[in-house]
Amino acid sequence: MMLLSQTVGRPVVSAADAAQVGTVAGLVVEPDGALITALRLDGVKDGGDVVAWRDVHAVGPDAVVVGTTGVARFASADGADRQNLLGKRLLTELGDEAGTLADVAFDPESGRIDTLHSSRGERIPGVRLLGVGAYAVVVGVGGEKSL
């Protein structure tokens, strides 16, 4: 597993020519399925500021390798604000405070979110992720999606 906090700031390079495309700024996630759908980038000179997860060849200790130098723009109107995960308020579906999101552990090959780390030291399974909004990350309670 890799941690988002260790991935942010890593250079993103093209597999074609090893040229730096940008640096990792964050993740775009799909709560349904707890999957990373894209990487948000900083420092991109040409093109968009997001690369689709399917174009990520490897997430290593020193860099992220992507298969294309042209990055796809994240066109959703609710994009970047909703995807700044670290430090975002963490709430249960009942509205109870669960601290803030301190980190996200994910599988660097599949993009599956394994664990959400709360500022209170709780480890919340990724399958409990219900939503990511501008205000908070929401996790399920009860049954398989409980805290």
Locate the predicted segments by residue.
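Peripheral interaction segments used for macromolecular assembly
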Residues: 1-147
